[in-house]
C-alpha cells in the first residue's frame, strides 16, 4: 500500500525555504508515525513533475530522502495552461525517472486536456495517452503505479467550482484545461 503525505506540495511551498523546512519536519514526523502503524506501508510525498527541474528541485530532493518512492503529477502544460506537444512524454518521463533515482516513481495523476482553446485536440490527447503507455512500458518496473486523472470530461459547474477553489475563476484557460481532461 502507498501513502502520499501531501499533494503537489511544491505549488504551495514554492521557493519559501522556511516553509520547506517546516514541511520536512511535519513530513518526517507523519511518516514515522505511519510506519509505526504499518511498517509495510510505502510512504512518499507528491509534487508536480515540473518540480524535478525547477527552483523546488533541491528542496524536493531533500524531502524525498526519507521517502520510499517519489510521487508526481504529470500534465505537460505551459504556464498559461496551453499544452506542450504529446511527443514531450518520452523526455519528460526520462527526467522524472532520473529525478527519482533508485526509488520507484509513482505517477499519482496523469492527464492531458483536449481543448482546442489550449492548442490541443482529441487526436493530441489520444497521442499523449499512447505515448504515456509506451514510456511506461519502456520504464520496466520503475513506475509501479500510474493513474490517469479523469476518464471523462466534467460538468461546466464542476470546472467553475474548481476555478474558484484554486483562485483561478477568471482564467478561461485553467477551466478549459480542467473541463477537457477526460
What residue spans do the PLM features occupy?
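Active-site groove signature of glycoside hydrolases
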Residues: 1-20, 44-46, 107, 144-152
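Aromatic- and acid-rich polysaccharide-binding/catalytic face
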Residues: 1, 5-7, 45-49, 53-94, ...
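Short, glycine/charged-enriched secondary-structure capping and boundary segments
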Residues: 17-20, 58-60, 85-86, 120-122, ...
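Aromatic-lined substrate-binding rim segments of carbohydrate-active enzymes
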Residues: 17-45, 86-87, 99
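Extracytoplasmic/secreted cell-surface and envelope-processing proteins
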Residues: 12-16, 53-56, 79-82, 114-118, ...
